[in-house]
Design a protein with these regions (language model features):
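Conserved phosphate/pyrophosphate-binding and hydrolysis machinery centered on Walker-type P-loop NTPases
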Residues: 25, 29-33, 61, 97, ...
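P-loop NTPase nucleotide-binding core
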Residues: 55, 62, 66-239, 400-402
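C-terminal alpha-helical "lid" subdomain
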Residues: 179-198, 319-323, 333-437
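Amphipathic alpha-helical segments in well-structured domains
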Residues: 36, 68, 100-104, 263-270
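Gly/Ser/Thr-rich loops at beta-strand to alpha-helix junctions
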Residues: 60-65, 252-253, 384
Length: 437
């Protein structure tokens, strides 16, 4: 398996550090076929003008973020725009100190397309939209780009897009700013273009500032930022993209909010998103939220503590142990030992290619490693890919640098320390979940 060294190094560094790489995921993807297929079905619905909403639930290290990145890369290749953010104490869905707006800013900052997958694609999208409208007008009229008669035709097409947005909540102001951007683009006014981009990114703190610089008497706030994402989704379809996917990870940070009322406001925002997508109010929009079982199911602090969400999301009496990937909640099951073995085989190949050595970890060594990992107490239900990956990369690093060390000796020795179990991590967090100042 030949992998560019830049990608191989990124994979090794990210995976050993316990984080999901942005590049090279296909080289290490194993399992999760049913979950990926279910999410890709949602993608088809979004492209047809529908909307979707999913929770991905799994323990720390079970592959939630990995699955998000896999879907992210796939939909960008299918001409979707993706915005993603990790929640934190400073980034929530709703807050009294701008935490909701901070999440919006992070989402827009990370706006990505196939040609700009690292984020910051907003200006590229707007410029591409204008160029696309101009090209369509040229093809329809037969006029040249420099012909003065082309400008009214382009204006007419721009107006048609803007009119379709004006009917939505905050659509009039959104459309007005698109018009400002288009006219600034025509006149080469980079300063105005920068101001419009600043507004779209949610960086105007007051209405007064926005009115003085752009002539609009509105700014994006904690209360209405989600409405602007719905506007973006509809605009992006008009700009010849397939739709927009919103990816929000670390939902546990809402679970950890000490104030019950603040938590309820955040769950209310989730309910709004859920209802919009399920009832058909949102179009060309997909939303995926990721969290742990505890942050979903805890009856006092979790998502299910909000009765309106619990009644919509809780499993029915027929589900039992069977998987239902058509429900809004996708629960990640542990990878099988066979899938884990395939994963470590891929890691061994990548490691050998990166450091240019002949494979020194035998197939039987890998089998022994997996047997030992799954032989730990509670591993059948609690072991996660993150633990296995970090342990195995550590084994590879040690035997590569110490050629006299045998894998079997290393695994049976007392010096080798396994990665911390995901359940232990979650339990440690839970010790302080109720602590308030």
């Amino acid at each position: 398996m030949k992998i560019p060294k830049r990608i191989a190094q990124t994979l090794m560094n990210s995976l050993k550090g316990g984080v999901v790489p942005r590049v090279g995921l296909p080289y290490v993807t194993v399992g999760r076929k049913a979950e990926i297929d279910a999410l890709l079905h949602d993608v088809d619905i979004i492209a047809d003008g529908g909307a979707s909403f999913r929770f991905i639930v799994g323990q720390y290290g079970s592959g939630k973020s990995f699955l998000l990145q896999t879907i992210r890369n796939y939909v960008m290749a299918k001409n979707f725009v993706v915005v993603d953010a990790d929640l934190s104490p400073e980034r929530r869905l709703q807050g009294t100190r701008g935490q909701g707006l901070a999440t919006y800013k992070e989402l827009v900052r990370n706006m990505s397309t196939k040609t700009k997958p690292e984020g910051g694609a907003l200006s590229l999208i707007l410029d591409r939209w204008i160029s696309g409208v101009q090209q369509a007008a040229v093809e329809a009229s037969g006029l040249s780009v420099t012909d003065p008669a082309l400008s009214p035709l382009v204006e007419k097409r721009i107006s048609a897009v803007i009119a379709s947005l004006s009917e939505m909540v905050h659509g009039f102001d959104f459309a007005r700013l698109l018009t400002l951007y288009y006219r600034a683009h025509l006149s080469g006014d980079d300063e105005t273009k920068a101001k419009v981009l600043k507004w779209f990114r949610g960086e105007y703190a007051t209405k007064t500032e926005a009115r003085q610089e752009l002539g609009v008497n509105i700014v994006i706030t904690d209360d209405d930022w989600y409405e602007y994402l719905k506007l973006f989704a509809c605009f992006l379809k008009q700009a010849n993209y397939a739709g927009m996917l919103i990816l929000i990870d670390e939902l546990v940070n809402i679970y950890k909010i000490p104030n019950a009322i603040t938590r309820q406001y955040n769950y209310e925002k989730i309910l709004t998103m859920y209802n919009d997508t399920m009832q058909g109010k949102a179009q060309h929009l997909g939303i995926i939220l990721c969290g742990t079982p505890q942050c979903m199911e805890d009856p006092r602090r979790g998502v299910y503590s909000y009765e309106a969400l619990r009644s919509r999301l809780a499993e029915g009496r027929f589900s039992g142990t069977h998987k239902d990937l058509l429900s809004p909640v996708i629960r990640l099951q542990p990878l099988t030992p066979e899938e884990m073995l395939i994963l470590v085989e891929k890691l061994a190949d990548i490691h050998a290619g990166l450091y240019e050595y002949e494979q020194i970890v035998a197939q039987q060594d890998m089998v022994d490693f997996i047997e030992i990992e799954f032989g730990r107490i509670g591993a059948d239900s609690h072991i996660t890919p993150r633990e296995v990956i970090r342990d195995f990369i550590e084994v590879l690093d040690i035997v590569y640098q110490n050629r006299d060390v045998k894998v079997r000796e290393l695994l049976s020795g007392g010096d080798f320390a396994y990665a911390q179990n995901a359940v232990q991590e979650e339990s440690a967090d839970g010790l302080f979940a109720e602590f308030e100042l």
